[in-house]
Amino acid sequence: MTKEFHHVTVLLHETIDMLDVKPDGIYVDATLGGAGHSEYLLSKLSEKGHLYAFDQDQNAIDNAQKRLAPYIEKGMVTFIKDNFRHLQARLRETGVQEIDGICYDLGVSSPQLDQRERGFSYKKDAPLDMRMNQDASLTAYEVVNNYDYHDLVRIFFKYGEDKFSKQIARKIEQAREVKPIETTTELAEIIKLVKPAKELKKKGHPAKQIFQAIRIEVNDELGAADESIQQAMDMLALDGRISVITFHSLEDRLTKQLFKEASTVEVPKGLPFIPDDLKPKMELVSRKPILPSAEELEANNRSHSAKLRVVRKIHK
């Protein structure tokens, strides 16, 4: 049975407007989710334009088929159920060699967080899962119960940036010797036991960073984003654009670095001109990230950490 996807789209107009949509163009929504960005983008296309929408969650696609029905009837939408790390291969399978723009809304979607049984949330008791693609084999349960101490410390530091990573990994080791850690609540309670009283008084849930780290590991989120954004830059037509929304420092750092590398070039001093093969491919559309408006922040609590970065293709 398909579950409803209740999702408030973050930075909706900014993300799509910054793509400078060409009515007859070919566009990609790399993270379909609740289909808010897709719907707004489609409203800017003529019937000659086309949108390719990626999501690895069948539930998202099922719901988007209802929301986007008027555009589907006109043959303007193609859904691709896959991880966006396969962007280039899947688009080429359909005959697409170039795209005019693409948007990314990175991280976990609100409906996935809100569906208790998906096991993403530390606020709701559920089996440890955290798979965005429910056909994937690696689950949060596997990570928590089967990764050794050193691997747990590595992902907690790298993806959660939690200063208590070693202590939490040790406590998990001790707990699972007694019995497997099976639920989100069990894991959250173990994390709470490690955190000092002053940490527990701080704003935000004490398990937030560790849950983020496990989720990123289960879905290889940063690896997938890195591969996909690089493929997107290769596939962009001249003057095409990429919009990327991030929600935490790791995603933003990755996006910022990829865009910086593609938009700058180091050449020896004294060269009278820059050879074509050394010219940067991309140009930053905005030097600083675009942030949600005060109105959006008030209306949607989940938009607080959102940042939007945009680049434009200026050279093949």
Swiss-Prot record:
InterPro entries documented for this protein:
RsmH (IPR002903), SAM-dep_MeTrfase_MraW_recog (IPR023397), SAM-dependent_MTases_sf (IPR029063)
Instruction: Please give one Gene Ontology molecular function term for this protein.
Output: rRNA (cytosine-N4-)-methyltransferase activity
Q: Which reaction is catalysed here? A: cytidine(1402) in 16S rRNA + S-adenosyl-L-methionine = N(4)-methylcytidine(1402) in 16S rRNA + S-adenosyl-L-homocysteine + H(+)
Superkingdom per UniProt? Bacteria
**Pfam families noted in UniProt:** Methyltransf_5
Name the GO cellular-component terms. cytoplasm
Keywords assigned by UniProt?
Cytoplasm, Methyltransferase, rRNA processing, S-adenosyl-L-methionine, Transferase
The UniProt record lists the keyword Calcium: no
As recorded in UniProt, its EC number(s) are: 2.1.1.199
**Record-linked SUPFAM superfamilies:** Putative methyltransferase TM0872, insert domain, S-adenosyl-L-methionine-dependent methyltransferases
Q: Where in the cell is it found?
A: Cytoplasm
GO BP, sorted A to Z? rRNA base methylation
**Residues annotated to bind S-adenosyl-L-methionine:** A35, G36, H37, D55, F84, D105, Q112
Q: Does the keyword Transcription apply?
A: no
Describe its function. Specifically methylates the N4 position of cytidine in position 1402 (C1402) of 16S rRNA.
Tell me the protein family, please.
Belongs to the methyltransferase superfamily. RsmH family.
- What is the name attached to this protein's record? Ribosomal RNA small subunit methyltransferase H
Upper classification of the source organism reads: Bacteria, Bacillati, Bacillota, Bacilli, Lactobacillales
In the UniProt record, the gene name given for this protein reads rsmH
